[in-house]
Amino acid sequence: MTSKSKSQLLALSLVCGALLLTSRAAMAQVEFVGVNAKATLTDNNTVATVTGSIVCGPGDTFQINSVIQQNHAQTNVAGSGNTEPVACTGSPQPFAVQVQVVNPPNATFQKGPASAIVSAFTGPSDDSQTLTVKLLLSE
């Protein structure tokens, strides 16, 4: 084997090794597949369920947090909620977050447009991703 061939083989080996390490690191990350644009109202319009799907690497767990803000009748209504931790599989997994109205007290969501911040967190890899989405709240 010539010196040039050895150099090319070494370079190819380094590139393959870097790709392998990069793909393993990517598996530890959390990524939204999507967040549904429609959220369902329940519990006398005090809860909106935000749904979607996520991918994260095996060996991790994920948790989803969401905050919804809606302006109606000159009132700014806000709610928050989170899921329990779920084991990651490496494949797309559905989630549903029940977002409860928290402010003002005794307020309700109304059918119509709203904004949401949806965040995914994984452990033990300690990765996260956050999306801001427009929602349509409906019964």
Predicted regions, residues:
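Bacterial N-terminal signal peptides that target proteins for export
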Residues: 2-12
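Bacterial N-terminal signal peptides
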Residues: 11-21
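Divalent metal-cofactor coordination and adjacent catalytic microenvironments
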Residues: 21, 42, 131-133
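Sec/Tat signal peptide C-region and signal peptidase I cleavage site
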Residues: 24-28
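Short, surface-exposed binding/anchoring microloops in extracellular/periplasmic proteins
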Residues: 30-73
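Short boundary segments that mark the start of a structured unit
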Residues: 30-31, 41-49, 82-83, 90, ...
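Ser/Thr-rich low-complexity repeats and stalk/linker segments
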Residues: 58-129, 135-137
